[in-house]
Structures are given as C-alpha cells and as structure tokens.
Amino acid sequence: MDAFLQAAIEEARIGLAEGGIPIGSVLVLAGKIIGRGHNQRVQRGSVIHHAEMNCLENARRLKASVYQRCILYSTLSPCPMCSGAILLYKIPRLVTGENKNFQGPEEYVRSQGVKVEVLQDPACIQLMRDFIKARSELWNEDIGE
C-alpha cells in the first residue's frame, strides 16, 4: 500500500478513536508529509473541519507556489467544500482512497486540471462502510443530508 495513503488511513483511525468520522488526509511535498489531519466536526463542534480542511489548516500558511507542487491524499472522495479548497490553492494532484461510499465532484475537479486518482482501497472502503452502518445519522449530517 502507498505509504501516504497509509498515513491518511492512520489519521482516519485517530478520528474514529476520538469519536469522530473516520476520514483522514495528508498533504505531500517532494515525498514528505507537510500536513496531516482528520475529520474533526464532532470533536470540535465544527461545520468545516473535514479531513482535507483540517490537513490544510495543520500545514499552516504556505506560499501559493508550494501548494502548486503538492499532492493531497484523502481516504474518501472530497466533498464540494474540500474540492473547492483543492482548486483554490491549485493543488495539482488528488489521490483518493475510495469513492464507493461517497463521491464528491471529482469530474469537475478533473475538468479544472487536477489529476484525480481513485484507488478503491479495500481498507478505506471497509472503514467507511462500517462507520456508515454503525452511525448513519452522523454520516448523513456530515454530507449535508
């Protein structure tokens, strides 16, 4: 398994252990993780702390030229809000663990020039499948339903 996706899965598991939604993300520059995060909507009582947003926040302020050389990894297909952040900061590549349990606007992100790779990783799929089955009400809240 890709080491960076594995790091994102570790973040997702941390979030689950904290009582949150198991989605994780890492930001990679030149083969090094420069930001990592997990969904913290429950833990922080936040409407915006999705994994990707938390990851970008934890990377701190970076020059635009840095984002433009990064790869963002996420265990689940990013939602419209997080996809917007990818486009805003011109992150050129997104690697997603899976999009079977939820699919964000991947085609739109691609149409804006971002290389989107969906791995359909069994661990990512199962982690979300188990969570959705156990906590469907919380999951539906997270995706705005």
Give the ranges of each region predicted by the language model.
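A short, polar/charged loop-to-alpha-helix boundary motif
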Residues: 43-54
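Mobile, glycine- and charge-enriched loop segments
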Residues: 52-76
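Zinc-dependent deaminase
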Residues: 1-15, 68, 78, 87-145
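Short cysteine clusters
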Residues: 55, 79-82, 86
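Short beta->alpha transition motifs characteristic of CBS
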Residues: 34-41
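A short helix-loop-beta-strand connector motif used in the catalytic cores of GNAT acetyltransferases and
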Residues: 17-23
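Short beta-strand scaffold segments in enzyme catalytic cores
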Residues: 23-31
